[in-house]
Every structure is written in C-alpha cells, then in structure tokens.
Regions:
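Structural recognition of the beta-strand scaffold that forms the well-ordered cores
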Residues: 8, 48-50, 81, 173-177
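An aromatic- and glycine-enriched ligand-binding surface/loop that stacks and positions planar moieties
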Residues: 1, 99-105, 109-249
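Proline-centered turn/helix-capping motifs that create local helix->coil transitions or kinks
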Residues: 40-49, 133, 183
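Short linear capping/connector segments at secondary-structure termini
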Residues: 51-58
Length: 250
C-alpha cells in the first residue's frame, strides 16, 4: 500500500511523462492498493484507509467503514480498466494488465452489491478479452517419476507445469508472475520452512528419541522409488517416510 501510494502521490510531478503512460502506471498502482485493501476489508471489516504518503510518526489511525473503502476501490479499478493495456500490448510478463484489473473490478463490484455490473465485466473478460478455459492438453508434458507417481497426460497437469505457465497456448492465464529459482525473477520464499519442519535434519526426533524420518540416497539398499514422495512432490511437502515408532502418530 505504501509503494502504491508513493506512485499515486508523486506521478503528477514527473516532468515530461506522457499522459497515457502516466495513467497506465497510475492504474497499476490503483490495482496494487485495491488488491490489498479488498483483502483487508474481507478479513477485518472496517480498517484505516491510507491514501497518501505518511511522512511522520502517526498513532491516531481511525477505521474507515468497509463500504466506503470498497466504493473507492470500485472507482479506482474503473480507472485502471480504462487505462492499463492488455497483456498482448505489453512487453513484459508479470506486470499488471487489463485482464487482471477487470478481474479485480469484478470482485469489487460483487463486494459493493453491484451484481449486474459484475456480470457485464465478467462477460467481457470471458468472451472478449482473449481468455478461455483450457479443455485440451497443451504445452510440454513431463512424467518425471512414473515409479512413484505415474501421470497420464491431462489438462490440469499441463496447467500446473512450470514450463506451461506463461506460454501463448495457455489461455487461462490472466496475470502470471514467474518466480523461478536461479532466474532474475526468482524470489525465495519461506513457505516450506513456515509450514513444515526441516524434516530431513538429524536433530528431529520422535518422542522415544529416534530419528524421525529416513532419507535414503538413491544408491542405498533401503531406497524405495515407489515411496519417494520427496523428489516427486518437492522437498518433503508431500508424504514423508516415518519410522515405525512415529507412524501411528502420523
């Protein structure tokens, strides 16, 4: 919200900026602010609405009515839909595009009880914006661990393959933000560490003080490919192989 407000507050002071470019980036800033505030309104109801840069310590925040915030978000997103370009007219993937703005405007209309307007915008998004539901297989198919988890080629699998996320054949993608390890777009997250322990660490023990999880090398005599969910689903987020002493608890 702070970064969005920075753009909103200062964009008119940028000398020599073309009006269409200014409105394009202003619309994107409105998107980012509206996206966060819509989530806050649904999570907490009335919240303080900060629409400008806070340049000094402030402790007297007062909540704004949820209904008033949503009405403001509707106005902002109507502007964004008008001025932010379609993805096909943009150079970069990952920046806010018109389709994403329209989708957020639909949600704002629904939150504001303007159901007919929401339907009209949804019809445009579905039928007139170049998007459609994928019904046939497409893109790259991979079946990397057939012994553990054999995959038959299908649309859902194709949709969730990293190589298929941003290709032109994927017509379901409205706003895609690539985040790939080792690339310029890679942003490391701590989701895995926040949700599960470092399960293959030798310091994790069962209540009876035994090693909690076995992690066998591929060449180990006890390695069983049919149980290797770690390599199949990714770093232990699937099913882990526990010792007999902790299986009942699992």
């Amino acid at each position: 919200i702070k970064y969005a407000n920075t753009i909103i507050s200062y964009i008119d002071k940028v000398e020599g900026l073309d009006e269409s470019i200014k409105n394009e980036y202003l619309g994107r800033a409105y998107f980012h602010r509206a996206y966060r505030y819509l989530n806050l309104c649904f999570q907490f109801g009335d919240v303080p609405f900060v629409s400008k840069i806070i340049d000094r310590p402030k402790q007297d925040y007062k909540s704004t009515k949820r209904e008033a915030i949503i009405k403001k978000l509707v106005q902002d997103m109507e502007f964004a839909v008008q001025h932010v370009p379609d993805q096909k007219d943009m150079t970069y993937i990952g920046m806010i595009n018109k389709g994403a703005c329209r989708q957020l405007l639909i949600k704002c209309y629904l939150a504001n009880g303007e159901f007919q307007k929401a339907k009209e915008q949804a019809d445009i998004l579905i039928s007139q914006s170049g998007y459609k539901l994928m019904t046939e297989t497409f893109g790259t198919f991979s079946n990397p661990h057939p012994t553990t988890w054999n995959i038959t080629n299908n649309v859902i699998w194709n949709l969730h393959q990293g190589n298929n996320k941003v290709i032109a054949a994927n017509k379901e993608a409205i706003l895609v933000m690539p985040n790939r390890y080792g690339s310029d777009s890679g942003i490391r997250t701590r989701t895995m560490r926040n949700l599960v322990p470092w399960w293959n660490a030798t310091s994790i023990s069962t209540p009876d003080n035994k090693l909690a999880v076995d992690r066998f090398a591929l060449t180990h005599a006890s390695y069983d490919a049919s149980m290797d969910y770690n390599r199949t689903f990714g770093r232990g987020v699937g099913v882990e192989i526990g010792r007999a002493s902790c299986r009942e608890r699992v």
